[in-house]
Amino acid sequence: MSRRGALLRCLFLAAIAAATSAAEENNPVTRAGPPRGTLLIVGGGAMGGLWDVFLRLAGGKESEIVVIPTAATTVDGEDAVLGVLRTRGAVRVTQLHTRDRSAADSEAFCAPLRSAKAVWITGGRQWRLTDAYLGTRVQRELEALLARGGVIGGSSAGATIQGSYLVRGSPRDNRIMMSPGHEEGFGFLRASAIDQHVDTRGRADDLRPVLRAHPALLGVGLDEATAIIVRGDEAEVVGKGQVRFFPAPEAAVHVLRAGERFDLGARRLSTASR
């Protein structure tokens, strides 16, 4: 190869490397967490300072926030969460609710999501969320919100729905861990099953049967008043209690407290925690 040809080849390879680096920067590759955006996944119970964490992640009190209360048994007027957020200084809070899938698929209904910086999904029963929104424009707009760097938070049912496998999805009884027809979550945290209220309801090992049936899943069990902040493949624990990470059906559980971090992709303590 001539010197000129070699130079051109080097320039060509450098251009490919630069383009690849730029593409990875714009579309980072992750194995579990969202490539863009942030998740706040709360184990239920009293929120306390976790509301301030949510508002900080959302970009402050002026950010547009949408509250989705559909997991509740009934939604009569504004959900109490809107008042809580306003009391803490949020000034642009909107409620979004329907049980009509055709409405959930409409552009007009989803309009608030397109300008929102953050979304909060309240507690209740997670099957109501999938019946209303799974596979609709609402779910696609939530994914788009994350893709533009937004924040999705939720507690209890609003936590479990963020996993890919929906535990306790049975409309009959929330003690049923696997319910055919209600086993798919929104999948913001991929290849995962998320449980909540672990400490107060004696659920420390309830995820084991799910993981034996679906061994590719990462199990995440959250105490009340406790959360993980997920950015990319890293989860940081915040709050009062513990978070249990089950990397495999029979593997030892990793129990983390506030300030500790877990690598969701590698399924081990992150280097920051070690």
Regions found by a protein language model. Name each.
Residues 24-61, 72-79, 84-87, 92, ...:
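C-terminal and late-domain segments of enzyme folds
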Residues 112-115, 135-149:
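Catalytic-core regions built around general acid/base machinery
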Residues 126-136:
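Glycine/threonine-rich flexible loop motifs
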Residues 2-10:
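Twin-arginine (Tat) signal peptide motif
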Residues 120-123, 142-166:
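Catalytic nucleophile loop
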Residues 9-18:
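Bacterial N-terminal signal peptides
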Residues 66, 72-115, 121, 128:
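Portal/gating segments that form or line small-molecule/metal binding sites
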